[in-house]
Amino acid sequence: MKIAIEAQRIFRKEKHGMDYVALETIREIQKIDRQNEYFILVSPGEDRCLQESDNMHIVQIDYPSYPLWEQIGLPSTLKKIQPDLLHCTGNTAPLWCHTPLILTLHDIIFLEPKQGKNQSVYQKLGRCYRRFVVPRILNKCRKIITVSNFEREHICKFLHWEPKKITTCLLYTSPSPRDPTTSR
């Protein structure tokens, strides 16, 4: 099976929680699955924290912004690769994509009433983008994964969904990069 994994931001130097979830998930898949063929779809970045292997290929997609990368670059690349499945790891996905989709929905804070006013323009635009995209892709997903039972219950309650539509997968178990008592 050919599986594409969207991991747009894993090569950026300053990673966020979702980036670590994607990175560690991919590293674990790389250790245990030698049968399927994987295409890790990334943006260019300084931190080459993942290496290719026999069945795992890194595909760099170069677009100037997150929305253009996801809505134009990613679907264009998928047409070339022709994967059997796409896993989008960071809450959003292409609006027009014919590849069967699995989505990791970490939280839905962007759908809730905004708290505070100290957001940068970048954060405000990102929030608007997610508020537009996420409701439009959820029904297209073959499976939705979230990272805790608490968030699963919250998503189901907020969106009035049946719990069976969402799977909890405790993905990230690596030591915190800020924790001096642990080592890799």
Where are these regions (language model features)?
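Single conserved hydrophobic/aromatic residue that forms the stacking wall/gate
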Residues: 172-184
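Carbohydrate transferase catalytic cores enriched for Leloir-type hexosyltransferases
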Residues: 1-174
